[in-house]
Curated annotation (Swiss-Prot):
Organism: Homo sapiens (Human)
Entry's family note: Belongs to the AB hydrolase superfamily.
UniProt keyword annotation of Signal present: yes
Lineage, broadest ranks: Eukaryota, Metazoa, Chordata, Craniata, Vertebrata
Keywords, comma-separated and alphabetical: Glycoprotein, Secreted, Signal
Signal peptide range: 1-24
The name this protein goes by in its record: Protein ABHD18
Sugar attachment sites: 282, 307
Major localisation: secreted
Bridged cysteine pairs (disulfide): none
Keyword Transcription regulation: no
Compartment(s): Secreted
One Pfam entry name: ABHD18
Length: 414
């Protein structure tokens, strides 16, 4: 099966954009790792948000075929992990698009979670919610992601999360905020209720439905079982998992975290050895930082070819120029450490985002997963299938890659 060149190009463009400040504060990571254990268990998580959690409507706008309600509420995340969210993200904001007429006595609602870069409501309202009003008389509730739109920190550039911990905060917050909105919709007499999302939004919707204590229709589009992208079983990957599970409470034992944080500040895009020794030496001073989904999907094949090239030419370098060989050996060691650090991060990300680490939805037969056949942005090779994790769910495939499907095939998602 081929892969989309557009996806590969987009993935490369994402590099150096996200997680520019590294992992985040060690004390924040410790609290988030502990909190993940709570929301990974539906029996515990369902009691975190009460059925009467307060939700407020700020404005109602009448249109020809629908009403648009704007509302807000305090993110439950702020209660359970205080001061972990930026002040701009504490207030959760949403838009509720309701048809003026229903097709039956039921009032169905679908909650749409935002994909990467989907700020505010325009895209989901225009491409999903308004057509669903016309086609099915179905209401849509659009929740704004933490770190996006009105909830974006002032010092954040566009969608570029500054820390790895920000992604974990976003995921935990969306799980609890979705629960608050589902409770509110039930109180208001709406139903049946369902959830969907595209790309990152689909993954977040999957985590939210996993924690809802009732059967819930779910349509995750262009997402898969984990945010880590490429599944690996190396020691560094396992170390990343164990790091989360047994994160120490002692600050003086965080050397591994600090080491990886420093290592991730190496330039992962500089994978070609300069012919000038001075350039080899100075390359260690370059700075990029690990990146979000782009980093998680970083192909390690180039690194392997790089190491193979060094190994093949070892004797030639040694005999002709011992000093150059010494510098290249240092570069090779640095690249090896860089590679291990990236794999370590994938282990941490997998432990925190893999749906297998969350409860199985109450009724997986209500889940339809939509995938692109040529998706090179979220590859499925080597990753546990959602059909294996959620027995009974249905997988549907559409032609094309991740980006082309996201841009041009949203009608199929509806």
């Amino acid at each position: 099966m081929g892969v989309s060149k557009l996806d590969i190009l987009y993935r490369r463009l994402l590099l150096t954009k996200l997680f520019i400040r590294g992992w985040g504060r060690p004390e924040d990571l410790k609290r988030l790792f502990e909190f993940r254990k709570m929301i990974g268990n539906r029996e515990r998580c369902q009691n975190l948000v009460s059925s009467d959690y307060p939700v407020h409507i700020d404005k109602i706008e009448e249109q020809s075929d629908c009403k648009i309600l704007d509302g807000h509420f305090v993110s439950p995340m702020a209660h359970y992990v205080p001061d972990i969210m930026p002040i701009e993200s504490v207030i959760a904001r949403f838009q509720f698009i309701v048809p003026k007429e229903w097709n039956s006595k039921y009032r169905p609602v679908c909650i749409h979670l935002a994909g990467t870069g989907d700020h505010h409501y325009w895209r989901r309202r225009t491409l999903m919610a308004r057509p669903m009003i016309k086609e099915a008389r179905m209401a849509s509730l659009l929740l704004e992601n933490p770190y996006y739109g009105c909830r974006k920190p002032k010092d954040q550039v566009r969608s570029s999360l500054k820390n790895v911990s920000d992604l974990f905060v976003m995921g935990g917050a969306l799980v609890l905020e979705s629960a608050a909105l589902l409770h509110w919709l039930e109180r208001e007499g709406y139903g049946p209720l369902g959830m969907t999302g595209i790309s990152m939004g689909g993954h977040m919707a999957s985590l939210a439905v996993s924690n809802w204590p009732k059967p819930m229709p779910l349509i995750p589009c262009l997402s898969w079982s984990t945010a880590s992208g490429v599944f690996t079983t190396t020691d560094s990957f396992k170390m990343g998992q164990e790091f989360v599970k047994h994160f120490t409470s002692s600050a003086d034992k965080l050397t591994n975290l600090n080491l990886v944080s420093r290592t991730l500040n190496l330039d992962i895009s500089n994978q070609v050895v300069s012919q000038k020794p001075a350039d080899c030496h100075n390359s260690s001073k370059t700075s990029v930082s690990a990146t979000s989904e782009g980093l998680l999907l970083q192909d390690t094949s180039k690194m392997k070819r790089f190491n193979q090239t060094l190994s093949t030419n070892k004797s030639g370098y040694t005999s002709r120029n011992p000093q150059s060989y010494h510098l290249l050996s240092k570069e090779q060691s640095r690249n090896s450490l860089r590679k291990e650090s990236l794999i370590f991060m994938k282990g941490v990300m997998d432990e925190c985002t893999h749906v297998a680490n969350f409860s199985v939805p109450v009724d997986p037969s209500l889940i339809i997963v939509v995938q692109a056949k040529e998706d090179a942005y979220i590859p499925r090779t080597g990753v546990r299938s959602l059909q294996e994790i959620w027995p009974g769910c249905e997988i549907r495939y559409l032609e094309g890659g991740h980006i082309s499907a996201y841009l041009f095939k949203q009608g199929l998602f509806r």
